[in-house]
C-alpha cells in the first residue's frame, strides 16, 4: 500500500490551509456519491488526498461550494 504524505500534496497546492480546505471539499463530494478520480480503496479523506497528490484535483475545489 502506497502511503500518501502531506509533502506530496503540497507540491500541487503549496498553501497547507488551502490544501486542507480542498481536501475537505473533495472528501465531502466523494461521500455524497461523486465518482473518484483515482482507485478508491480507502476512506474518502485519503482518496481526496490521493487525487490532489496525483494532480487530478486542485485549487479549483475552493471555487466550488459543496452542496
UniProtKB/Swiss-Prot annotation:
Q: Has keyword Nucleotidyltransferase?
A: yes
Q: Which InterPro entries match?
A: DNA-dir_RNA_pol_omega, Pol_omega/Rpo6/RPB6, RPB6/omega-like_sf
Q: Which Pfam families match?
A: RNA_pol_Rpb6
Instruction: Name a GO molecular-function annotation.
Output: DNA binding
Asked whether the UniProt record includes rRNA-binding among its keywords, one would answer: no
Look up the record and give one Gene Ontology term from the biological process aspect: DNA-templated transcription
GO terms under cellular component: DNA-directed RNA polymerase complex
Keywords of the record: DNA-directed RNA polymerase, Nucleotidyltransferase, Transcription, Transferase
Question: Could you tell me the EC number(s) of this protein?
Answer: 2.7.7.6
Tell me what reaction this enzyme catalyses.
Answer: RNA(n) + a ribonucleoside 5'-triphosphate = RNA(n+1) + diphosphate
Q: Which HAMAP family match?
A: RNApol_bact_RpoZ
> How does this polypeptide assemble, per the annotation?
The RNAP catalytic core consists of 2 alpha, 1 beta, 1 beta' and 1 omega subunit. When a sigma factor is associated with the core the holoenzyme is formed, which can initiate transcription.
Q: Which family does it belong to?
A: Belongs to the RNA polymerase subunit omega family.
What is the annotated role of this protein in its UniProt record?
A: Promotes RNA polymerase assembly. Latches the N- and C-terminal regions of the beta' subunit thereby facilitating its interaction with the beta and alpha subunits.
Q: What is this protein called?
A: DNA-directed RNA polymerase subunit omega
Q: Origin organism of this chain?
A: Ralstonia pickettii (strain 12J)
Q: What is the lineage of its organism?
A: Bacteria, Pseudomonadati, Pseudomonadota, Betaproteobacteria, Burkholderiales
What is the gene name?
A: rpoZ
Amino acid at each position: 500500500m502506497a502511503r500518501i504524505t502531506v509533502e506530496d500534496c503540497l507540491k500541487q497546492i503549496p498553501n497547507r490551509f488551502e490544501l486542507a480546505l480542498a481536501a475537505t471539499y473533495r472528501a465531502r463530494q466523494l461521500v455524497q456519491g461523486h465518482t473518484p478520480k483515482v482507485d478508491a480503496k480507502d476512506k474518502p479523506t485519503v482518496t481526496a488526498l490521493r487525487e490532489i497528490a496525483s494532480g487530478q484535483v486542485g485549487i479549483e475545489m475552493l471555487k466550488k461550494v459543496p452542496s
